[in-house]
């Protein structure tokens, strides 16, 4: 593992212009440099490079980042691989955490030895070969996907011992396990083996299928270990990646045999997940290939749930694609085995766009008989569409209108929708929040979260990243992304005050929440987002009682009450006033102390 200090030293010494010049012709323009952007069909130099700040930016496609990010995207490398490439181009010697690095290097040789044994062993088990032939596989398929067979546990252990491989090391890469008596046994016993490679063509684990109907677990994967993390890996990606790059499309299915079947049917860009659905850890790999995603899952409850979760994940992360559900209880392997590959082509062609699929699934979980039912369904949909780009969100207006049988004028799917840009929610609010101060305050709050990852859950309980202009950066901090992310590296290079205390942090979140409510212009006061924000602020008040002195709390409540004075939604008012009454009682001051009186109709109660 490369040390962070080594990466920082390399970052300070490298010249980003020199790095990019290794890939594209660069021309000087004033104090900066320009070049043709390699990340879109650029004809004029749209990419600008700032050698002082060490960042590039394309004004056409918005690609940008530091030298590491450029190499990652250009060569489709992981962060660690990109760092090594940049170091090589810069004649820089990186430092590694030696023990772990050397140990990992030794461990990488264990699984290939086992795989060679499994492949050879398959030849001696005709009953297993017969099963594979019955599943419409031939010798060419078996060789292409390196299928094998794991026999008795003692056979695998004997092989490892003969090759002088420490059994503890074999266990650390998932080849062995220990029983209740602390005795070693093989992870794969009497199973067909499917070797699993990562995106760098490193063998990191196996899948195994039993032919014994009495064994409850038909399929198993290698256990999680130093090499294998099933939430980050696709089966058959090593075979499919060239075609994924060419087609800019990836088919994601449920199992090993399904992925193999897709390849037999001519879909050489197919892979399989190793769990029930996609995870956020798969997204960087998909983005690296700029690929649209076709989800092809079974039409059972598990398949539909996996497709729904995956459609939400992809849509909200700006990845395009569609969902193709297999009907009739057949999976791709069955269709190919029965020479029905044409049906597979038709199923993929008739797939439903990701967002539309997710919205249809959401509505299917609601009764939409009464107007109130439809309002609740709409608010559920808004929780999804408010996470999308406005143009994308508004493209679903007609769909939602038709499904709910509600006029389009009542369908608001984007916070920035023209339908919502009317008069300000609070036109008389005298408390203005200077944009520059909010910008600085946000960065300070984000820096505090970066320093104290243990309070990320506190933040999620009392605010929402949608309130922040730096939403993408904040989400990355909340996801606990590290130095390998270019936005995090750029953020850490800024000179931001980082000596906040917890009470300042809480008060700062409240200020940002209120600033968002102050600036957003929402006609419909029952929108889910607005109700959610008021609820979050109310939750935050209880924390403020414990962490702010009376004067600080007094000042904040003045600003908060100025919003509530003009609120028309009874549900919001009742809940907020209940919370406020408790605060007034605890702090021994009243609404009158905050400048409100019945005589001038400013009394909030």
UniProtKB/Swiss-Prot annotation:
Q: What SMART domains does the entry give?
A: TOPRIM (SM00493), ZnF_CHCC (SM00400)
| Coiled coil residues, start to end | none
GO terms in the biological process aspect are: DNA replication, synthesis of primer
> Cofactor binding mode, per the note?
Binds 1 zinc ion per monomer.
Q: Name the source's superkingdom.
A: Bacteria
Q: Where are the zinc fingers (CHC2-type)?
A: 37-61
Question: What EC number(s) does its UniProt record assign?
Answer: 2.7.7.101
* Ranges for domain Toprim: 248-329
Q: Which Pfam families match?
A: DNAG_N, Toprim_2, Zn_ribbon_DnaG
Record's PROSITE patterns? TOPRIM
- Which GO molecular-function terms appear in the entry? DNA binding; DNA-directed RNA polymerase activity; zinc ion binding
Q: Which UniProt keywords apply?
A: DNA replication, DNA-binding, DNA-directed RNA polymerase, Magnesium, Metal-binding, Nucleotidyltransferase, Primosome, Transcription, Transferase, Zinc, Zinc-finger
Under the cellular component aspect of Gene Ontology, which terms does the record hold? Answer: cytoplasm; DNA-directed RNA polymerase complex; primosome complex
Q: Show the catalytic activity.
A: ssDNA + n NTP = ssDNA/pppN(pN)n-1 hybrid + (n-1) diphosphate
What does the entry list as the binding residues for Mg(2+) 2?
A: 298, 300
Q: What cofactors does this protein use?
A: Zn(2+); Mg(2+)
The UniProt family comment states: Belongs to the DnaG primase family.
Q: What role is this protein assigned?
A: RNA polymerase that catalyzes the synthesis of short RNA molecules used as primers for DNA polymerase during DNA replication.
Q: What is this protein called?
A: DNA primase
Please report the organism this UniProt entry assigns to the protein: Campylobacter jejuni subsp. jejuni serotype O:2 (strain ATCC 700819 / NCTC 11168)
GN (gene name): dnaG
